[in-house]
From Swiss-Prot, chain A:
The modification Phosphothreonine is found at residue 158. The gene is MON1A. It comes from the Eukaryota. Plays an important role in membrane trafficking through the secretory apparatus. Not involved in endocytic trafficking to lysosomes. Acts in concert with CCZ1, as a guanine exchange factor (GEF) for RAB7, promotes the exchange of GDP to GTP, converting it from an inactive GDP-bound form into an active GTP-bound form. Residues 102-141, 158-185, 211-245 are annotated as: Disordered. Belongs to the MON1/SAND family. This is Vacuolar fusion protein MON1 homolog A. GO terms for cellular component: cytosol; Mon1-Ccz1 complex.
Amino acid sequence: MHPGGGPSRAERLELGLGRERPAKAIFLHRRPGEGGGRERCLRCGHVCVRRGPGPREAVPSGRPRPDTLTPPWVRQRAVTGTFCASWTPLRNRRAQRMATDMQRKRSSECLDGTLTPSDGQSMERAESPTPGMAQGMEPGAGQEGAMFVHARSYEDLTESEDGAASGDSHKEGTRGPPPLPTDMRQISQDFSELSTQLTGVARDLQEEMLPGSSEDWLEPPGAVGRPATEPPREGTTEGDEEDATEAWRLHQKHVFVLSEAGKPVYSRYGSEEALSSTMGVMVALVSFLEADKNAIRSIHADGYKVVFVRRSPLVLVAVARTRQSAQELAQELLYIYYQILSLLTGAQLSHIFQQKQNYDLRRLLSGSERITDNLLQLMARDPSFLMGAARCLPLAAAVRDTVSASLQQARARSLVFSILLARNQLVALVRRKDQFLHPIDLHLLFNLISSSSSFREGEAWTPVCLPKFNAAGFFHAHISYLEPDTDLCLLLVSTDREDFFAVSDCRRRFQERLRKRGAHLALREALRTPYYSVAQVGIPDLRHFLYKSKSSGLFTSPEIEAPYTSEEEQERLLGLYQYLHSRAHNASRPLKTIYYTGPNENLLAWVTGAFELYMCYSPLGTKASAVSAIHKLMRWIRKEEDRLFILTPLTY
Amino acid sequence: MAAAAAGAGSGPWAAQEKQFPPALLSFFIYNPRFGPREGQEENKILFYHPNEVEKNEKIRNVGLCEAIVQFTRTFSPSKPAKSLHTQKNRQFFNEPEENFWMVMVVRNPIIEKQSKDGKPVIEYQEEELLDKVYSSVLRQCYSMYKLFNGTFLKAMEDGGVKLLKERLEKFFHRYLQTLHLQSCDLLDIFGGISFFPLDKMTYLKIQSFINRMEESLNIVKYTAFLYNDQLIWSGLEQDDMRILYKYLTTSLFPRHIEPELAGRDSPIRAEMPGNLQHYGRFLTGPLNLNDPDAKCRFPKIFVNTDDTYEELHLIVYKTELRPSSYTQSEASISASVHPTLDFCRRLDSIVGPQLTVLASDICEQFNINKRMSGSEKEPQFKFIYFNHMNLAEKSTVHMRKTPSVSLTSVHPDLMKILGDINSDFTRVDEDEEIIVKAMSDYWVVGKKSDRRELYVILNQKNANLIEVNEEVKKLCATQFNNIFFLD
């Protein structure tokens, strides 16, 4: 029935998770339409680096459209097509290649039968599921297969990567950092000197690759995009400095991204410049251990951890005072890494550093810090990341079917995914047959959308890489809110950069159809109560829960209510879930059930092959009542599943 | 899974997979102040095991530790790194005295698999070692050193770096061989003491015995009284007793059990003077009191190093009730002046007979206790209990302690789950309870209440949460009826 049942991975559907993603800084968000006053540059406050007219001017209407659609340096390449022979075909054949990739993806997908959810969900679906329940039978399992590539949360994030990483470190051995100084202090000294030198003489990659055009490039102003928050080593008096440093230290979670040469790429708090020597030490530690054919993972101290993730050509470091395990922090860092890939593609990223090892990547990413900031914030509050799944907007099945069908009919040749979302909740998702979206990619899209309000201003057409789908190339995403005053956002993912008008037309047709069938009113109504209350379940001591159906990659949870009203309390609750999750999914000692009794609440985690359930109760509840609540809750979810989940995902 | 890696893969399935347990890679002690300038790095190193390592390699490894510590001070000046995890190993850092750093590097367990083309593929198991366990082992290394050598600083005052290096070399060279890293577990974290439960009368008898003895032998400063490896009375400070207890029960006593079992008819007591028949003898000090040339060498120990800094001699005297039985009581006595042979004879004559009598009283108690607990059939659970306030520990998981291994009766994975729960407990001060079901379907319960911790492993695979809870309640009622645990 399930594993190996279907001839292909029927369950891999792409879904649209409405997760907030910050808009990427380096992309130009602008309406491609040139006529009728629609031509407006949707700037999101990011720095738009580009050639030709200054970034703040409207684009002249005669301008070739492709230029507006790709990151600046990519565009350069297309414009000066002859400049770099090896790159030109790359860009030109992008669409073709993407198609090939999909082909490949499709066939590889078939090999992996084990994850395939059953095709035969028609079998009877148990009322109150048992641990032995097969995937595809649990509440929330799709009737016709899933929409996602199967993510088993953490495990998924790491497996393939580790292989890649070791390959990288191998390379490192041959061409990596020069002979090792004997003393670490020496190394860090060297690095801090190095980074000072580099800031002095830094030359942009573009400048080097496009001599003669360098004067056209605007130097991205350093701090645009977000306010420079509390630089640790600035201050007028010593006391201030002390205070600032102390405040900087006490942040719950620091995140640093740097290049292998020790150049800062991103720092969550404090300016990269001020931290360049700290980052120099980080990269020195990494390469020191790699010289021994070893790899640094984490440092543990009282009250905090430092976690290192190495994804050549980048090094990512988190310093966290949260209760999260090193595993989970590494997972968050991977999200940051994917976030950077989604702006640049993996291919470009490695190309840049192959060309110039000490390239200052901030030139390309400047302005995108906000997207990363937003992602970090989201991960601290939204359980979607922890669950490795998407949450659906609660919606009557009939309405959802109408929406899905309308979305399905509004197709275009180049479309791969059509996703309707509302405030990081998925409303509907239609995918091309045999193409599946990975939850991580969806989360990144959600983050992109939620990190910028500029998408509300019209239609945006932006290149975006979906790193889990294909880290080598860009898709082109059409992003628009359906009506200015609602949270309904439509995301159309296309393979063809030139296809803006066709895709934009899909949006128009979709809206027309919705109106014709009257579904837009029902949708509007549903948006008024985007979350349900846990009281609807009817279990008095139950305060909150997370339930994930593994085969569909979807999860559901009620609104977080009292006593978790403040932000701190909400993060604390998520912290408790994270704690249970990390114990249940511990790589070497996984657990099936956890019952935790704390001073403020009791929690229960239950992980089976088909679903995961996390419940939070009042501290007064007994274990007996908790056990009976499980069954009651599972029955309720089964009863409500067609409202809480997307059971019949569609393909074009 | 397969329990503890049969000697590096000579097992029946060695063909496919070999397992190697965690191993001590290196152990070093350094002081960054001793070689602040370039070219002097070697001076920082006070002790390095294995000593054969090339000089530059030593300097590099010390440099890495310094860098890690310095780096973490960026984020927390007063709480630098405790451990470093890498793919291949874990390093544990401890700064027991200002600027003196002890570092222990433990290799992760390895599984060696045969790849398809026949080449061995090595896989490091990165999540197997528990930080708290090995950090505790490292701290214990220092405590043990300090017990027999005093502080690092004292050695520096007495004879400079040279003397310190000598002492470190002499002590750790042997001590490191007694670390059995693959069998370290939760009990190493607690470093607790097993107490012998006794009725009031017997307890008072022991106390008055100790008082009288200390009075008549005035060089005696502190006395501890043990029975069957369990502590009954101690005059020492808790922390000093804790490490002394560890030494006695895992090193000194076991070393003396084996020869006794081998040669029961040893002539030590053959020519006892007088008619006071007893089986007392010295475990430290002279072997034969009647030999006028017998050497009276007692190990020195250092206690109260934080304030009065006392340098004492450790006298361990032991008596057996019947020569053939295991039951034994030991008095460990600390004296301030160097005890002479004459003193030893006096002690033997005073303590020997009385200790024998006391031992028989205690033995009676022991049998009563045994009957009470033995009346139940084999319980469905095993437990470990620890009280942070008096260091009392009790384990039915561990079958026996030997100098080399502590044998447990449960799967190592379950022991690690206990360790995980313990480290979760440390993160908050509040009372907590955790019940988990492992993949093997065993239930594991951890309770923390009022600085006491209880861990239970239940062997009822088909039980549900409620039944498990009932079972643990029952256990608490019978074993810990006066201790409140969160329900």
